[in-house]
Amino acid sequence: MNVSPNRWEFLLQSLRDLDNSLVQLGSRLFVIKGRPVDILPSLFKEWDITRLSFEPDCEPDCKARDMVITNLAQQAGIEVINRVSHTLYDPETLLMSAGGRVPLQIDAFKELVLLQGRPEMPVATVDRKQFGSCTTPVGEDHKKRFGVPTLEEIVLHKPLTVSSRFYGGGEREALLRLEKALQQVNGLAYCLERNT
């Protein structure tokens, strides 16, 4: 996969942030290294998985992979749950509503979104109660076997220069940037109000 070090670092920071959040809930993030279709079937058995949930991807190659994994899981008697959560609206639903044509102008996109109605309200923040009786099989070899890799481990064949203008990844970083942007907007609104 041809991905820049900046993008890899953003993704890795996001994974580390997610892992830190899960640690606070008594769990961990498991980064599975390798092809999912090769590795997941053995993990289904090793971990006695009964339910698999994942974010559906809209890229054609990823859709094919997801279908194979869904079939493997269902053949193993595992319930499979797909939920769109990285966008306010399901991209596939929007595309179908547009007759399969991607809106090329913002006005056409806004019109399409208005037809969908308001997006669903966000779910509550995950807490320890929601984990219930779930257990996380964290072993002594977790970091080596399932830990978040370093940039050097992923990008072995490229120079590892990350731009100084790089935006950090992760939910905490995103919330900090959002708060800063809202403060700037509020400050601008205050200045405009005083000048009128």
What are these regions (language model features)?
Residues 78, 99-196:
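Glycine/tryptophan-enriched, flexible segments
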Residues 1-128:
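Trp/Phe/Arg-rich N-terminal binding region typifying the photolyase-homology
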